[in-house]
Amino acid sequence: MRPDEWPARRAAMVALGLMLGYFAVDNHVPLYPWNNLAAAGPQWPSTLSGWVPGLLTIWALARRSRWGITVGAGWTVVWVLLQLRQWWLPYLLGPTPLHRDFTWYWEGGYSETLRILPGRGARPVPDLEHVALQLLSLTAALLTVRAAVRMWSRATAAA
């Protein structure tokens, strides 16, 4: 292990672990009004959609797998982009070809959770529960991409 790449990988592993831990607690521990699990329905598919690739990314970081870290970094970026698509596009732009119907927001009970952003008509408002997840996810994505870049730059420098 090269000492100069370990801090980047360790930071990414910690960020991913914190994000996954928060995601699991948030999906399965009722903390109303932070989350509203009563209206959300089963959360295991959602949890596993984050945990499986997240744990594989942590494993790749621990094993120093350049390709695994790169794929994991790609997943973290897609993970953040999907959250932006789900919450921020409807909030900022209203109905778009991607979001014509906002019943998921009202039926999922998200309108009853804590928010700090002002409402914008009948548009979904990103609640604190999801803003926290998005900040953790963005941090994990940035640190995992940084770890991937460091792994590849070290490999090309050694070649």
Question: What are the functions of these language-model segments?
Answer:
Residues 53-54, 111-140:
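Hydrophobic alpha-helical transmembrane segments
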Residues 4-17, 60-79:
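Interfacial segments of alpha-helical transmembrane regions
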Residues 1-50:
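Transmembrane alpha-helical insertion/packing segments
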Residues 93-97, 139-159:
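Cytosolic juxtamembrane helix at the C-terminal end of the final transmembrane segment
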Residues 88-113:
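Juxtamembrane non-transmembrane "cap" segments at the membrane-aqueous interface
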Residues 16, 49-60, 132-146:
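Hydrophobic cores of alpha-helical transmembrane segments in multi-pass inner/ER membrane proteins
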Residues 19, 70-96:
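Hydrophobic alpha-helical membrane-insertion segments
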Residues 45-49, 71-74, 78-81, 125-136:
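Physicochemical signature of membrane-embedded alpha-helices that form the seven-helix bundle of GPCRs
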